[in-house]
Design a protein with these regions (language model features):
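Nucleotide-sugar donor-binding/catalytic module of glycosyltransferases
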Residues: 1-230
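Residue-level detector of alpha-helical secondary structure
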Residues: 50-53, 108, 236, 240, ...
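Helix-centric, low-specificity signal for extended rod-like, repetitive segments
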Residues: 71, 155, 254, 284-287, ...
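A compositionally biased, intrinsically disordered/low-complexity signal enriched
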Residues: 97, 102, 245, 251-252
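Generic detector of well-ordered alpha-helical segments enriched in charged/polar residues
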Residues: 146-151, 236, 253, 274, ...
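Alpha-helical scaffolds flanking conserved acidic
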Residues: 185-186, 250-254
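Catalytic core of nucleotide-sugar-dependent glycosyltransferases
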Residues: 197, 204-212, 218-250, 258-283
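Membrane-interface aromatic/basic loop that binds lipid-linked glycans or pyrophosphate carriers
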Residues: 267-324
Length: 324
């Protein structure tokens, strides 16, 4: 049977860690390795986790809790867990979320039968103790999926609700970067999808909590935006080095516009975006769109051009003779 490593960073989740950990320990699948990374959490999260382990003696021997000497952020915590993992596949579980009891079993069964690099499952959003409607993964070819991801704001760049083949991660050194704590999943997933092959399952394998106001997704601060800009720059670097046929150039430049849209909406100086990205788009239209945003044209008006162009691109890549 395949061994699955579940990787969970812990910081400031004493309200949620018990519910999360119980869902992990009560999985129907046996060969699981649990790696929790304590990123110097200031609350009682680790104590709650350690007390809970007494109720699951059969799982306790499968658990490792790694402590950071100082708070280093979620990017570093994910990387610490990744490097400690020994499983055939990795499953990222955030410490305020939950898994259905048969989630790992269903993902592992599909991995075993398909030998795919990425097994992508369905999920439900969780709010106020209730699960929302089922969200299924995009059922499109791998190359198109990556282009949609890189365009940004079309499909999610989530790490959770999936399992990733560890050997492919190590072979291509697909690592997280300390200091990128928001949108760290964007450039990480793009790299994995560039090399890997994906299959889907329709079963719900993850409950994604939307009512935790302390999560990164609820705090779009300037600090988080700067992290997102850095993630986008890493994306540019990766494709400049590896996309020799420029298959993802247009998608990358469409995604770059998103950084300026976010900056405008958050009133972040455009100079900070320019400095972080350090990139001049090849497309004249993309340069024009960015210029309009920087000149103060309302984003809603610029979107009339930008979203139409993005929509046209997504239609073209779906055509039989797809464009780059």
């Amino acid at each position: 049977m395949l061994k699955i490593s579940i990787l969970t960073p812990i910081y400031g989740v004493e309200k949620y860690i018990e519910q999360c950990a119980r869902s992990l320990f009560e999985q129907s699948y046996a060969p699981i390795e649990y790696i929790f990374v304590d990123d110097c959490t200031p609350d009682k999260s680790i104590g709650i986790l350690q007390s809970l382990l007494k109720e699951y003696p059969e799982r306790a021997q499968q658990v490792r809790i790694i402590h950071h000497e100082k708070n280093r952020g979620v990017g570093a915590a994910r990387q610490t867990a990744l490097m400690a993992a020994t499983g055939d596949y990795l499953l990222f579980a955030d410490s305020d979320d939950m898994l259905p009891k048969d989630a790992v079993e269903k993902l592992a069964e599909k991995a075993d039968s398909s030998h795919a690099d990425l097994i992508d499952g369905s999920y439900r959003e969780w709010c106020d103790g209730k699960a929302d409607m089922l969200q299924k993964p995009f059922d499109v070819a791998d190359g198109k999926l990556l282009k949609l991801l890189v365009c940004q704001n079309i499909i999610t760049n989530r790490l959770w609700g999936r399992i990733y083949k560890r050997s492919l991660i190590m072979e291509h050194r697909i690592f997280f970067e300390e200091g990128i704590n928001y949108a760290e999943d964007l450039f990480w997933n793009a790299q994995f999808m560039f090399y890997g092959k994906k299959v889907n399952i329709d079963d719900a394998v993850y409950y994604y909590r939307t009512d935790n106001e302390n999560s990164y997704n609820h705090n779009i601060s300037e600090k988080n935006l700067l992290s997102y800009f850095k993630s986008t720059r890493r994306l540019i670097d990766f494709f400049e080095q590896n996309d020799t046929e420029h298959q993802y150039l247009r998608a990358t430049e469409i995604g770059i516009v998103n950084a300026y849209r976010w900056a405008a909406n958050a009133h972040v100086a455009f100079e900070k975006v320019d400095q972080a990205l350090a990139y001049k788009p090849k497309s004249c239209l993309i340069r024009l769109i960015i210029k309009l945003i920087k000149k103060g044209v309302p984003v809603k008006r610029v979107n009339l051009i930008y979203l139409a162009y993005r929509r046209l691109y997504t239609l073209l890549i779906s055509a039989p003779s797809a464009v780059s």
